[in-house]
Amino acid sequence: MGVQHLLKLRMASPHPHPHPGAPLAARPLSALASFFLARPSSTAAAPPPRHVTLSCSRPHCNHNQWAASRCRGTAGRRRLQVVVAMSSSAPPPPPGSVQKSEEEWEAILSPEQFRILRLKGTEYPGTGEYDKLFAEGVYECAGCGTPLYKSSTKFNSGCGWPAFYEGFPGAIARTPDPDGRRIEITCAACGGHLGHVFKGEGFNTPTDERHCVNSISLKFIPASEDSKL
């Protein structure tokens, strides 16, 4: 059937607005013209975009975890960096971190060190090696090597024992004597006896404290050999 014949039939039709499902002969003139005269597109229409769900091949991850932490790899690396950064400035040993039996201490300490550090003895005033020493350096525990005092905190108290106005943070433990008259100071790491601390004596120091320490309880490390200053 030719186009002209269809057009004639359409013009003679009594129904100007047929149903969309009507045959071609019953459709409007504009629809017929579009049907026969429209050129086919040279390029097919692009398919609608599909929704893509990201997933991870690692069995322990779902796509939400992948999007949030890239299979936890990024978060794990960050945690590792934090741990490394924290370890670069290590705090002093925690209290009681050096544990030895009294027999072990007796084997590694000299008799005088054992008497003072472990049996809480006291050396005679004015006889200690470090009483009059004011060189720059660090004083460590003679028992376990924990840094206790900077030389910059040492002062001349005239008492006959080395005197310091403060120790390294967390390095010194304080325990009141049973009679309550004095406060004993010990190495926080190994419990070695250092001496006693007194406050309010009027010394011109930042803390108005005097750590009265036995020289035998200490080991001096000169500044040229120490990196903790």
Swiss-Prot record:
This is Peptide methionine sulfoxide reductase B3, chloroplastic. GO terms for molecular function: metal ion binding; peptide-methionine (R)-S-oxide reductase activity. The gene is MSRB3. Its EC number is 1.8.4.12. It catalyses: L-methionyl-[protein] + [thioredoxin]-disulfide + H2O = L-methionyl-(R)-S-oxide-[protein] + [thioredoxin]-dithiol. The active site is at residue 212. GO terms for cellular component: chloroplast; cytoplasm. Catalyzes the reduction of methionine sulfoxide (MetSO) to methionine in proteins. Plays a protective role against oxidative stress by restoring activity to proteins that have been inactivated by methionine oxidation. MSRB family specifically reduces the MetSO R-enantiomer. Residues 102-223 form the MsrB domain. It holds the Pfam family SelR.
